[in-house]
Amino acid sequence: MNTEIKARFRVDRSDFTLDVDLSLPGRGITALFGHSGSGKTTCLRAMAGLERASAGYFALGDEVWQDESRGHFIPVHRRALGVVFQEASLFPHLSVRGNMEFGLKRKTTGTTRFSLPEIAELLGIAHLLNRPPDQLSGGERQRVAIARALLAAPKILLMDEPLAALDLKRKLEILPYLERLHSELAIPIIYVSHAPDEVARLADHLVLLDAGRVVASGALNQVLSRIDLPAAFADDAGVVIEATVAEHEVDDLTRLEFPGGAIYVSRRHEPVGTPLRCRIHARDVSLTLLPQMQSSILNCVSASVVDLAPTDTPGHVLVKLDVTGEPLLARITRRSAEKLEIRPGLALRAQIKAVALLA
């Protein structure tokens, strides 16, 4: 069964042109990432049918929703999709339950995978069903908006910076629920964001946009580890590793294992065997040619240099490393690179000074 998403759009405006040609996975979270004005929201609106591209094609598996070459265009209200915007836009005269029931009325396909009580439980809003929207926090309103979208039985969920209007506390409140959706839903999610932390935590696939064009598209780490794109991530350059809790040690440390080896973090509460996603910034990795020695840095792994490239920061370079098949980035000074004679193929040790757990 074909589940791939095909999206080709050209949208011309007086001061901006969107011109994209994408093939995206039919499952998991695809993040559309870029700076303000890069075309992320325009691309998402074109996918939804809210922005009709003069030259456009959009297919979800074998279902073609738009093909301008044949004059074919299914309007947004007839598409089996859910859309969540920055603002929740709940109906103020309806309770949480009433807003969710509105989603049921919008179904364009047969059955909803989850019932209203199941969705409410999944998103942690079961205790809020009788409340009016004005008695909800920003994070709670967004969860209700997501629930309403899911009850319409969508075949794809489009999310336009759903956390942008929330403060840090509310963002941290809602992120675990988005992760739960990721694991529970069989439908693809297209997620627009300009926040690297959100992308690193949630995405499986990453599309990098700039000035209306696709700069890069691929599996998350494949794009994150590209050293020809340092300007896109700047100080946030780094990689994501998928690790597993291996052991809780007696000195309040937890050992995580990943294909490239093991890393230690402060003691975690998750049981052994639990998968954890971690982020390692390039700025938190230093390099040494010396063998493993006494050091306060616990996490030190053997690596080989793949390539290096200059960064936007004068006097610095970005080094791509291979750690038993896993990519790792290090940002060091040009002077250090010259002193250590950093070059492709060089074997060395990478010292990881900090690991950010994305959970």
From Swiss-Prot:
Superkingdom of this protein's organism: Bacteria
Catalyzed reactions: molybdate(out) + ATP + H2O = molybdate(in) + ADP + phosphate + H(+)
Keyword line: ATP-binding, Cell inner membrane, Cell membrane, Membrane, Molybdenum, Nucleotide-binding, Translocase, Transport
Mop domain segment(s): 294-359
A Pfam match: TOBE
Annotated localization: Cell inner membrane
Enzyme nomenclature, EC number: 7.3.2.5
Membrane topology listed for this record: Peripheral membrane protein
Domain ABC transporter span(s) in chain numbering: 1-236
Record GO terms (molecular function): ABC-type molybdate transporter activity; ATP binding; ATP hydrolysis activity
Binding positions for ATP per the UniProt entry: 34-41
InterPro entries xrefs: AAA+_ATPase (IPR003593), ABC_transporter-like_ATP-bd (IPR003439), ABC_transporter-like_CS (IPR017871), Mo/tungstate-bd_C_term_dom (IPR008995), ModC_ABC_ATP-bd (IPR011868), Molybdenum_import_ModC (IPR050334), Mop_domain (IPR004606), P-loop_NTPase (IPR027417)
GO cellular component: plasma membrane
Family: Belongs to the ABC transporter superfamily. Molybdate importer (TC 3.A.1.8) family.
Subunit structure: The complex is composed of two ATP-binding proteins (ModC), two transmembrane proteins (ModB) and a solute-binding protein (ModA).
Function: Part of the ABC transporter complex ModABC involved in molybdenum import. Responsible for energy coupling to the transport system.
Protein known as: Molybdenum import ATP-binding protein ModC
Native species: Dechloromonas aromatica (strain RCB)
